[in-house]
Amino acid sequence: MLLLTVVLLVGVTLAADHPTLYAPKGGSIELGVGAKQKGQYKFEWRFGNLKIVIAEMSSTNQLEIKFPDNGFQNRSEFNPTKHNLTIHNASYEDSGTYSLHQEENDGTEHTDNFKVIVQGMSLYTYLQYALISPI
């Protein structure tokens, strides 16, 4: 019975949706799941179907990181320790769904989805303006 359970888990895709994130125009968008998980050898950050970062363990057990030439490469950072993605100088066009696809050695895949909305100003700035502006 245990063998059957293990066989059924191979190749399973798990997905998780995170709360919507709001970022100010011109600011930074920070996306991540927090901690590095063991057993994973391939990571892809995507914006829709566009790959932003591809990180994969090499045969020498080194993490190889690639930034495809697609407009994000000069303003994005990948944290190889926690697998987080930071996008700088956010624009309205950066609003949408970002996904972190992680693949483990046994073929199991995990996907974390993040919806991002880029706004004209931060909520903090808006509240400051609203509180000091005359009616």
From Swiss-Prot:
<dbReference type="InterPro" id="IPR036179">
    <property type="entry name" value="Ig-like_dom_sf"/>
</dbReference>
<protein>
    <recommendedName>
        <fullName>Uncharacterized protein ORF11</fullName>
    </recommendedName>
</protein>
<dbReference type="InterPro" id="IPR013106">
    <property type="entry name" value="Ig_V-set"/>
</dbReference>
<dbReference type="Pfam" id="PF07686">
    <property type="entry name" value="V-set"/>
</dbReference>
<dbReference type="InterPro" id="IPR003599">
    <property type="entry name" value="Ig_sub"/>
</dbReference>
<dbReference type="InterPro" id="IPR013783">
    <property type="entry name" value="Ig-like_fold"/>
</dbReference>
